[in-house]
Amino acid sequence: MSYNEFSRTSAPRRRLAQVSPSTTALRIYQCPANKACRIDAIYVSNIHSGVTDITIHHLAPGETATTSNAMYYQVSVPKNTVLIDDAPKYLLAGDTIMASSSTGAHVVITVYGEEG
């Protein structure tokens, strides 16, 4: 399936990944080989009793998580809050989404989308 064949209503979104990142960048999701992927939504839930910062990266194959590929860099998430990014993101085969949290394992990140 090419990117042109994706539409926001072509298939129900499904959970692609769910992780609780630590203070070092952790792979959340990697688009499989020979696939194109669409991320429909990223949910960030702060399950900690205080504010925590998150950083989320979109990496091409062979890249490492740095400030130059951060989609969100040290974004503060208040306690008991869910941040929702529902803007579509398109990944090529081997592209990776990684994340870290300032307080380690105090947020849950859930990724919804489609592999085509």
Task: Label every PLM stretch briefly.
Residues 1-36, 101-116:
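C-terminal interaction-tip segments
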Residues 28, 54-56, 97:
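Hydrophobic beta-strand residues in large extracellular and virion-surface proteins
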Residues 35-41, 90-93:
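Short, solvent-exposed loop/turn segments enriched in Ser/Thr/Gly
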Residues 44-49, 102:
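Short solvent-exposed strand-capping/beta-turn motif centered on an Asx-Ser/Thr pair
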Residues 47-50, 61-63:
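Acidic glycine-/aspartate-rich tracts in secreted/extracellular proteins
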Residues 55-59, 110-112:
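Beta-strand signatures of extracellular beta-sandwich domains
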Residues 59-64, 116:
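Short edge-strand/loop segments of extracellular domains
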Residues 62-96:
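Intrinsically disordered, low-complexity Pro/Gly/Ser/Thr-rich segments with frequent PxxP/GP/PP motifs
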